[in-house]
UniProtKB/Swiss-Prot annotation:
Induction: Up-regulated upon amino acid deprivation. Up-regulated upon hypertonic conditions. InterPro entries: AA_transpt_TM. The chain crosses the membrane at residues 77-96, 103-123, 159-177, 189-209, 218-238, 293-313, 330-350, 372-392, 414-434, 437-457, 473-495. Keywords: Amino-acid transport, Cell membrane, Disulfide bond, Glycoprotein, Ion transport, Membrane, Phosphoprotein, Sodium, Sodium transport, Symport, Transmembrane, Transmembrane helix, Transport, Ubl conjugation. It comes from the Eukaryota. One of its GO terms (biological process) is cellular response to arsenite(3-). This is Sodium-coupled neutral amino acid symporter 2. Its main location: membrane.
């Protein structure tokens, strides 16, 4: 349900052709026709952000003549909004429940502003560096190390996005089947076991779609994802006024104990005191606990869209950096409001009882609810069809790294696809909660893509500004902030894992 696949996009027509005198750095060349690119912009899936276009292997050099963009301002806003929003929205209420309303709004504001600033750095670097490819900017800045850092970060982000989608299948599909079959006792039924269902969906639906050599109609699923999330937000707001408070804590705790699909540690504080009107239904504005550390990575994970910015920029009609920044400002502000409303109303519905995946929390209280069942079906369809879109760039990166000089082979193509899907399924089965995926990927790959790489590329490639300039000093502080956020978040998350491991909290 999100972020398109990483990018070997067609090169911007106004690039310096001398920068591409050799094609030895890449084994793929990319189509520069507007029609080829435009037809794939619905493919930008928000949680991954790197859409790989089909390559033209016979081409020796990038096209350098000017090709004006053809995508309108409004459609560019939609494309970028679609690249931002994704499964991360399901974890925002959990983040608010562990930070408090005021602290969450402060963090959300800072992360959105920093993400927008990194888009500014990225656009300026692309203009000065003469490339609209994220990996190529890395190569121009730091050689092979920079290229691998960009490619690795985007691949990790894609794997995290894919895992989060399969986690949603693991969480929600058993509830849908249980609601449709009216089964009360699901003990021992394999078709109500989330792990079995993830494997089944992967084999029957995702694998066949992932074996295609091109995306075709799958590219349009990201648009469906955005619509599903808007529908989800409307339902979250409506349900706030239907779910009674205080929430029946015993019911939630029983549901948590009886299922492996919830986050046990999220409910521990609720066990230590009686649930009363003043206690359970009072919002908190500042909260600090062991789960607060996940808030920033979840927010960072939710705002990653940066590898999608460059191809959207290339296709923008009347293209200019100022115009693209206006597109970015509108998109980020719209997603800021959407994230804030989803987190706020989700939190004000369940307070400290919010689980790490908000949609699953409703089943503990409302059981079989028709409206929620429709939301679940829509979200399940969107994420299931989006996973094959996410697999494309990962497979292409692996192929490019290991077998760049070899001709296409269906056996190799299939083996890499199966391996990627198998690895992701293992993560989903053995990683206890979606919160861990949001936290780890948000703290590592997403921090690289938002903070570290854009600022490092800017410092290295924008030559006309001296290091003592305000712009370069700002980029340097941004880089150091990213390193601090990444190392600090990762350290605290690992400490939380170690601390909770003996008690089975993870």
């Amino acid at each position: 349900m999100k972020k398109a696949e990483m990018g070997r996009f067609s090169i911007s027509p106004d690039e310096d052709s001398s920068s591409y005198s050799s094609n030895s750095d890449f084994n793929y060349s990319y189509p520069t026709k507007q029609a080829a690119l435009k037809s794939h912009y619905a493919d930008v899936d928000p949680e991954n952000q790197n859409f790989l276009l089909e390559s033209n292997l016979g081409k020796k050099k990038y096209e350098t003549e000017f090709h004006p963009g053809t995508t309108s301002f409004g459609m560019s806003v939609f494309n970028l909004s679609n690249a931002i929003v994704g499964s991360g929205i399901l974890g925002l209420s959990y983040a608010m429940a562990n930070t408090g309303i005021a602290l969450f709004i402060i963090l959300l504001t800072f992360v959105s502003i920093f993400s927008l600033y990194s888009v500014h750095l990225l656009l300026k670097t692309a203009n000065e560096g003469g490339s609209l490819l994220y990996e190529q900017l890395g190569y121009k800045a730091f050689g092979l190390v920079g290229k691998l850092a960009a490619s690795g970060s985007i691949t990790m982000q894609n794997i995290g996005a894919m895992s989060s989608y399969l986690f949603i299948v693991k969480y929600e599909l058993p509830l849908v089947i249980q609601a449709l079959t009216n089964i009360e006792d699901k003990t021992g039924l394999w078709y109500l076991n989330g792990n079995y269902l993830v494997l089944l969906v992967s084999l029957v639906v995702i694998l066949p779609l992932s074996l295609f050599r091109n995306l075709g109609y799958l590219g349009y699923t990201s648009g469906l994802s955005l619509l599903c999330m808007v529908f989800f937000l409307i339902v979250v707001i409506c349900k706030k006024f239907q779910v009674p408070c205080p929430v029946e804590a015993a019911l939630i705790i029983n549901e948590t104990i009886n299922t492996t699909l919830t986050q046990p540690t999220a409910l521990v504080p609720a066990l230590s005191h009686n649930v009363t009107e003043n206690d359970s239904c009072r919002p908190h504005y500042f909260i600090f606990n062991s789960q607060t550390v996940y808030a920033v990575p979840i927010l960072i994970f939710s705002f990653v869209c940066h590898p999608a910015v460059l191809p959207i920029y290339e296709e923008l009609k009347d293209r200019s950096r100022r115009r693209m920044m206006n597109v970015s400002k509108i998109s980020f502000f719209a997603m800021f409001l959407m994230y804030l409303l989803a987190a706020l109303f989700g939190y004000l519905t369940f307070y400290e009882h919010v689980e790490s995946e908000l949609l699953h929390t409703y089943s503990s209280i409302l059981g079989t609810d028709i409206l929620l069942l429709i939301v679940r079906l829509a979200v399940l369809m969107a994420v299931t069809l989006t996973v094959p879109v996410v697999i494309f760039p990962i497979r292409s990166s692996v192929t490019h790294l290991l077998c760049a000089s070899k001709d296409f082979s269906w056996w190799r193509h299939s083996l890499i696809t199966v391996s990627i899907l198998a690895f992701t399924n293992l993560l989903v089965i053995f990683v206890p909660t979606i919160r861990d995926i949001f936290g780890f990927i948000g703290a590592s790959a997403a921090s690289m893509l938002i903070f570290i790489l854009p600022s490092a590329f800017y410092i290295k490639l924008v030559k006309k500004e001296p290091m003592k300039s305000v712009q370069k000093i700002g980029a340097l502080f941004f880089l150091l902030s990213g390193v601090l956020v990444m190392t600090g978040s990762m350290a605290l998350i690992v400490l939380d894992w170690v601390h909770n491991a003996p008690g089975g909290g993870h």
